[in-house]
Amino acid sequence: MPFVTIQFLEGRTDDQKKALVSEVTEVVAKNLKAPKENIHVILEEMKKTDYGVGGVRKSDI
């Protein structure tokens, strides 16, 4: 029962997230020979105010 967690910054559309879940599921199923119904994809969307790189929040760029 594979679990895939993807973290990304806010701003993706619902259609983009739907496609991501579908395509990741396909790749994992193919490579691990796992049934699609056993593959879990968790999307963790982060606010730009809650993420920083090099000491600067993404919301401040």
From Swiss-Prot:
CDD domains, per the entry: 4Oxalocrotonate_Tautomerase (cd00491)
Keyword Transmembrane in annotation: no
Pfam families tied to this protein: Tautomerase
One example GO MF annotation: isomerase activity
Active site feature: 2
InterPro entries: 4-OT, 4-OT-like_dom, Tautomerase/MIF_sf
Keywords, sorted A to Z: Isomerase
KW Zinc (keyword) present: no
EC number, UniProt record: 5.3.2.-
Bridged cysteine pairs (disulfide): none
PANTHER family xref list: 2-HYDROXYMUCONATE TAUTOMERASE, TAUTOMERASE-RELATED
The family this protein is said to belong to: Belongs to the 4-oxalocrotonate tautomerase family.
Listed name of the protein: Probable tautomerase LMOf2365_2536
Lineage: Bacteria, Bacillati, Bacillota, Bacilli, Bacillales
